Amino acid sequence: MKILYIGTVTNNEWYEEMVLTSSSQPSAAPQTFENTLLRGIKNNGFENIEWLTFPMIAAYPKSRFLYWGKEKQILDCGVQTTFIPAINLKGIKMFSQLISSRNLIKKWLEENRNEAEVCVLMYSIYGPIAKNVVNLCRKYNRKCVAFVPDLPEHMYMAKKGIGKFVSRFYVASVKKIQGKFSGYIYLTDAMHERISNTKPYIVVEGLADEEIFAPQPKDGKKSSVVMYAGAVSKTFGVDRLTEGFRKSNIDAQLHIYGSGEYVGELKAICLKDERIKYMGRVSHSEILQKEREAELLLNLRNPSDDFTKYSFPSKTMEYMASGTPVLTTRLEGIPEEYFKYCYSVNDNNVDTVKNELEKIFSLSPTERKELGERAKSFIKDNKTGEIQAGRILNFLESLF
């Protein structure tokens, strides 16, 4: 089997520089997820694969990139990817990607015309490129598989002005092609009902990079810090998390890392309550270290939000791999097996958060530590990038 992988992943150093020089910052989750996936494929000993990247860069002038050509990069997992060229201007970017991706995909399919088993694996159903993947694979009678991290209607949610109209048009265009792949890789089982309920699929809710399984602090001591890392947004319940902590009587600080629309309000709260610290956006390696040092990690999205049924919070797996205990809401998108290894609540109401924090901190440090270590072992034994990538490769083989 030969694979062409098309995704958004870039070199980490280049990615961090791009983020720092852009006024509109992308989510770090896909970068982490894809790096782990590709490293997992490599660790499975699979080598018949080539890579293309459509980087998630804000349109000029929100980023400094006006154009990029067929730039080649060595990714952190050691493989080389080629950028799909684009003119990075609103209204032109997608059209330029439509043209350039068609040429690159067609060239690869032509080069592998005589191979028996050929598959194009695409991360995210990104309209301009996905259209070419589907049409060209049909023309050459090849398999194409989509890795679906989010439903299109949840990824593009502009709420006002011309952006709202463009978002609706874009989502409608993606829905026309989303059911035309040969197979799918979903984060949750419920996603197949919204994308394609007739095609083969596999559920891979997440994967953990082997590199994040570092030991706990040598002295065994934890800092008295409750921590959240991710999008600093009301959509993800950071406002309720913050207020629940403020009302609690626990002897700890709350440290929040990331960026988002709630940052302004959060900074104002920090001035009123010295226990709460906004730490900004830092490198992923620093986040991993802080997660290992913390006393408790929080991820408290609202279970009543529709999107939580169709998404698995990638931070949940990263948190659990740290060895630090985790408090999460019981989201439909999280498989039941995970809740045996973390603290959980049924909603993210302020009083619920307050009461659960006080309950957890009434437990002995030893009891909390044991839960964190059991969670780490669960992830390490079942959910590493290598294990999950092996499942994906087996699924792709099953399509032939």
Language-model-derived ranges and their functions:
Residues 4-6, 217-236, 241-246, 254-255:
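Conserved donor-binding/catalytic core segment of Leloir-type glycosyltransferases
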Residues 153, 167, 171-215, 277:
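Donor nucleotide-sugar binding/catalytic pocket of nucleotide-sugar-dependent glycosyltransferases
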Residues 35-39, 106, 128-131, 135-140, ...:
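Membrane-proximal helix-turn-helix segments that form the acceptor-binding/catalytic region
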Residues 362-397:
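A charged, aromatic-enriched C-terminal amphipathic alpha-helix characteristic of glycosyltransferases
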Residues 291-309, 324:
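Acidic donor-binding loop of glycosyltransferase active sites
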Residues 1-68, 115, 243-249, 331:
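N-terminal subdomain of nucleotide-sugar transferases
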Residues 264-291, 296:
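Nucleotide-activated donor-binding/catalytic signature segment of Leloir-type glycosyltransferases, i.e.
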